[in-house]
Amino acid sequence: MTSTSHFVASTVKKPRSRYGCLICRSMRKKCDEVHPQCGRCLKAGKQCIWKQPGTERKNKTKWRKAMQNNSIPIQDLADDFELDFPDTLDLTNPDALPVLGESIVNPISLPVDVASPFLPSECYPSKVELPYFPLLSKPNTLLSLLNDEEISCCEYYCYSVAPITTILPGQPNFLPQLLLPMALHEESVLYSLVASGYRLKYGNDNSLALQKSKVFVNRALLTLPERRSLNLSKSEFVVSLACYILLVYTEIAFADTTEWATYFLNAYNMINKMGGFKILKECSSEGKLLAECFAYFDILASQSNLNGTYYSISDYTDVYGVDELQLFESLENCIKPLVLIIGDIINLLVESRRAGFDDLQHTLNIYEKSQTIEGKIWSCVPQYEDMKSNKLDSEKSEPLQLFKLYKTTTEMYLRQVISRMPPVSLEMQVLLHKQTQLIDLLLESSLRNSLSFPMLIAGLNAATDLQRTNFKNRVNCLCQNYTIGSLKKVWIVVQEIWKMNQNGNICIDWYEVVQKFGWRLNTGV
């Protein structure tokens, strides 16, 4: 699908000239074309902005044919593509973009017909407005650097990837709300979006798309503000971190077990150079959203179970406790408090392993901390803002079922890695039955992209032949409907543990199996 087809109205009640002023076109109003100040702008007291002569839309026949075909083959990239959105806001002119207080329709909010075997297509974002991020308030679009195929990949990311990372229905998602405005004037973010779009749209099996994706990854890294400046400003820091987080997400989405960790380590080192994790509190909405993403991927990484999280959970909690974050949905949203508790369990695991259980006082200390964590799990409820928004008011709502699933999974994880309960223990079996019932409710839901970690814990605790057969069927069901994410690698790990624990009567640490494979597995996607 060509990039302009999303922006052209399907029906036109009355003709509008392509040569009207940009202000009228941005509001989709007919312009009387009186120079130098049209009547509408004169009445509104606005400065009239006109397109430069010679920049009008060209090649009408070519555009009409592309729109009728509804797609352009990846081999037929148009290197001389000239970006122009007729009868709407001219994104190539920064002066035509709205200032704070005005709003435009986000391009990603319009209907789209994008078919792909790699992502589900049943959910698309509802109409939203571009947010105002103080650090990035003066966009200067770079879309003209891309041809139509590259723009379509960027759009695909926003249309088809952003919706499946949304947990609360209708909640604005951070991916388009943060990354798209950045991409309009930051090359590194724009190139990262294109690189991700190529892989997510065409998959890893398309060698040409994969090659082009790698080209744009290299471009993104070369244009990172971090690479160009020794003393980063806060806005440059946010842009660089956004680029790293986007690359991390994309690699994890394709079950990568090496590259994502490299990008993540680069992000960690950059944060430290800026003064540590708490610096993100000073970076307005953008920094706080990225802080949540960083913590989420840190906690759900296999190596954190061996070394501990990069930053303390108290640091993560400190940044999380900001009301502004309720404006947009991050990756974990309503399961956020449970993700933080999983982080507490992981760090307690590392502490217990380092000191051992030979010392009674230390053993009692670990036990008391585990009891405190268990109390947190029992008292944990969906965030107040989520409940107040009436999005979790139904007992059968998918977000609430996901919260219950993660709550049960967190309880199982505490007993597995701290109390060392084997799968065949009565308590673990009761929790497993409760967990699998919740998984079955979400297998074919729009939230199935959030099941990698619960599926891992369910697989580890499947002790009988019937339980393992049912688990395999659930994996097959998920893989048929959702082909990105780390689930296939989770399945490999689970099968290896079944070989080592045929009767389910011992407790085996999954992260040590992952380390034996030489992997760094992340269950965040």
Swiss-Prot record:
CDD domains: GAL4. Residues 21-48 bind DNA. GO terms for cellular component: cytosol; nucleus. One of its GO terms (molecular function) is RNA polymerase II cis-regulatory region sequence-specific DNA binding. It comes from the Eukaryota. SMART domains: GAL4. Keywords: Cytoplasm, DNA-binding, Metal-binding, Nucleus, Transcription, Transcription regulation, Zinc. It holds the Pfam family Zn_clus. SUPFAM superfamilies: Zn2/Cys6 DNA-binding domain. Its main location: cytoplasm. It is found in: Cytoplasm; Nucleus. One of its GO terms (biological process) is positive regulation of transcription by RNA polymerase II. Gene3D superfamilies: Zn(2)-C6 fungal-type DNA-binding domain (4.10.240.10). This is Uncharacterized transcriptional regulatory protein C965.10. It comes from Schizosaccharomyces pombe (strain 972 / ATCC 24843) (Fission yeast). The lineage of its organism: Eukaryota, Fungi, Dikarya, Ascomycota, Taphrinomycotina.
